[in-house]
Amino acid sequence: MSYPQFGYPYSSTPQFLMTTNSLSTCCESSGRSLSDSAAAASAQTPVYCPVYESRLLATARHELNSAAALGVYGNPYTSTQGYGNYVTYGADASAFYSLNAFESKDGTGSAHAGIPQTAAYYPYEHTLSQYQYDRYGTMDGSSRRKNATRETTSTLKAWLQEHRKNPYPTKGEKIMLAIITKMTLTQVSTWFANARRRLKKENKMTWPPRNKCSDEKRPYDEEEEEEEEEEDSQKATIKNEKKTVDEEVVREDKALDLSDLEDFDTIESESSECELKQPFHHQPQDGHQLRQRDCVNDHCKDVILKMPLNSTVNQELDRTNICLKSGVDQCEQDVLRGRQRSGESKACFQQQQILDSKPRIWSLAHTATSLNQTEYPSCMLKHQGLSSPSSSSSSSAVSTPVCVIDRRQDSPVTSLRNWVDGVFHDPLFRHSTLNQALTNTTVSWATTKGTLIDSGSLGRSVGNPTNVKGQLPNIPHDTNKEFIAFQKSGSKMFCS
């Protein structure tokens, strides 16, 4: 019987067909030697007697019967052809193992060397199969874990380059990449996690932090990595917010400083020229500023006049009132004692430092004796018009105290009173006690001085000879003597 449809002829004699004689020959007792068995087998018909276990033979019979039932081999074989006896073995089953080389001492080769091995069965190897993983995603213990080579990582790098915006492969993509690169699933996941870390450290991160998906459970290393990425992103946002807040605070501080400077400029610019020039300093001939000395009050000693920038007019009035009240009597006593001892004039005028728009300091003596209206406003020279007619009429009467009071160049205290009355219109300065004190001071000044200063000496000592009026020509005087005396008195310190 031949089967040309399978591509090769089949012999009509079945391979497993064994007669009773041949079976009995194979199942002979073990007393016969190997050479005798071989001789008996060669004398008879060649018998194919492969050594199989009963389990394999039963399976083979089942397959043959099913194939015969399907009609592959035509009619099924009957028991007359000897198929009923090929499974039934005798009690001496060890006869099949009598052909071993270990039984015969003179056996030179294996008895199975001439039997061809069937090609239908191959051992199942996980590494050679298409899908190497079981349903839990793990490898079989027999397969070895391979290291990642340059060829395998090039495939992963290509996939990562194509998915730079979302470098998170799914489970199916990881399995596909693992099959292509012949790596394990854990190796692929770890490689992608490390690649994302490298890109993040190199500031080449072009993807937003990925949130956890509830429907897909990723490996532990991916979840841990994503948690780290989320924490890093949160820290970065917090740092950026702190930086922006600090920058805003610095900008606000700078803006406040600039606004303060602008307000200061506007305050200075709004001050008019008609305001009182109240801080003064004395300008003697040598042109140096004089410091205040020889004052009775302790707080007047070694005080240099400075201009305060942030004081108000009310504070100036209070300070001036206190200074005038406390200093008139003491200054008068100082002038009288000094004049009686050394014959030199000493003047002490106490004037506190007051606000002024210009940083120039003037002395009270220069202000009281100067009549230049271009240098001082008209409000500071209010009583000059009232005192000039009296000074012109006082040329005939020298001994009267009224004429002496009206003469501005004789008494600095009188000039101080006139100037203060012109600037500060306060009823306090018109009090009887203050007027009496000023009158007594003027009389004592006129009596102790002994001589009067003419216009030339006064002009040389003060610096304004053209505006001096009302001098008495009837009384002789010594110009050099008076000039020297006034210089000595002027060299002393005026306290204000």
Swiss-Prot record:
Note the SMART domains from the entry.
Answer: HOX, IRO
Q: Which GO terms describe its biological process?
A: brain development; cell development; dorsal/ventral pattern formation; heart development; neuron differentiation; proximal/distal pattern formation; regulation of transcription by RNA polymerase II
Q: Which tissues does the record link to its expression?
A: Expressed in the neural plate in overlapping patterns with other irx members, which all share an anterior border of expression. At stage 20, expressed in a subset of cells in the developing hindbrain with expression appearing above the otic vesicle by stage 26. Expression in retina cells begins at stage 28, continuing at later stages and is limited to a subset of retinal cells of the optic cup. Also expressed in the ventricle of the heart from stage 36 (late tailbud) onwards. Only expressed in the pronephros at tadpole stage.
Molecular functions per Gene Ontology:
DNA-binding transcription factor activity, RNA polymerase II-specific; RNA polymerase II cis-regulatory region sequence-specific DNA binding
Question: Where do the coiled-coil regions begin and end?
Answer: none
Q: Does the keyword Nucleotide-binding apply?
A: no
Please give the Pfam families that the UniProt record associates with this protein.
Answer: Homeobox_KN
Q: Which UniProt keywords apply?
A: Developmental protein, Differentiation, DNA-binding, Homeobox, Neurogenesis, Nucleus, Transcription, Transcription regulation
Locate the region Disordered: 203-246
What GO terms fall under cellular component here?
A: nucleus
Subcellular compartments: Nucleus
Q: Which domain of life is it from?
A: Eukaryota
Q: Which Gene3D superfamilies match?
A: Homeodomain-like
Bias-annotated ranges (Acidic residues):
221-232
Q: Does the keyword Endoplasmic reticulum apply?
A: no
Looking at the UniProt feature table, which residue ranges are given for the DNA-binding region? 141-203
This molecule's function is given as: Acts partially redundantly with other irx members in neural patterning. Required for formation of the posterior forebrain, midbrain, hindbrain, and to a lesser extent, spinal cord. Patterns the neuroectoderm in both the anterior/posterior and dorsal/ventral axes. Does not appear to play a role in pronephros kidney development.
According to its UniProt record, which protein family does this protein belong to? Answer: Belongs to the TALE/IRO homeobox family.
Q: What is this protein called?
A: Iroquois-class homeodomain protein irx-4-A
Q: Provide the species name.
A: Xenopus laevis
